[in-house]
From Swiss-Prot:
Name of this chain's protein: UPF0434 protein Dtpsy_1553
Species: Acidovorax ebreus (strain TPSY) (Diaphorobacter sp. (strain TPSY))
Annotated Gene Ontology cellular component terms: cytosol
Pfam families: Trm112p (PF03966)
InterPro entries with a match to the protein in the record: Trm112-like
Amino acid sequence: MDPKLLELLVCPVTKGPLTYDRERQELISRSARLAYPVRDGIPVLLENEARPLSDEELEQ
């Protein structure tokens, strides 16, 4: 994930920052408690495509 692109992207739900999880290929929104998939290098920032994050995942 290009760091400059990551600086421009925000969570579509909260408009908060996103962090990239390279291992899972996801963009994480801690404020929305959602993980958005990155497919073939393209972020899919759709709420209905995101998965909810557990408390354990948020603590990492």
